[in-house]
Amino acid sequence: MGGNEAQNLAAIQRGFEAFAKGDIETLKTLFSPDANWNQAEAGVLRGNYRGVQALLEFFGQLAHETEGSLRVEVLTMAASGDHVLVFERVTGERKGKTLDTKEALVFKLDSGIVTEVTELQSDYPTAAQFWS
């Protein structure tokens, strides 16, 4: 399990770059076939997304719900064993509402491939209001 920390950090960095560009083909290569994304916030996107296709649909729904305005800025990234922690700023607009919040993503990897992601909000009420 795990792989080395540098390999895991590089994989997550590639993922953020691919997400920003809408590079679906690269994103597909970074997740295990049964990867799980736990989206704990309230609102239309809450839930667990399992499998590459479900994750890609989730990413597409993020873009759709925000009419392409969603932006993610990585503030810091750190690796420990088979985990990478990303602290990020997320901005966007949706149905006349504006989002500007910070959140943490905890990625679990196996040899540079993401197997699990847990998303944690720093301001749950703001995120819940935006996505409701």
What are these regions (language model features)?
Residues N48, G96-L99, T126-W131:
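A short, polar/proline- and glycine-enriched secondary-structure boundary/capping micro-motif
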Residues Q61-L62, V86-E93:
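Short beta-strand segments that buttress and anchor functional surface loops
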Residues K28, S32-A79:
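A solvent-exposed, acidic/Ser-Thr-rich amphipathic alpha-helical stretch
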Residues M1-P33, A128-S132:
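Short, low-complexity N-terminal intrinsically disordered segments enriched in polar/charged residues
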Residues V72-M77, R89-T91, K102-F107, T118:
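Hydrophobic/aromatic beta-strand elements that line small-molecule binding cavities or substrate pockets
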Residues D34, A79-H83, F107-T115:
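Short, solvent-exposed coil/turn segments at beta-strand boundaries
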Residues L105-A128:
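Short beta-strand edge/turn micro-motifs at domain boundaries
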Residues A20, G92-R94, S111:
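Beta-strand elements of well-folded, non-transmembrane domains
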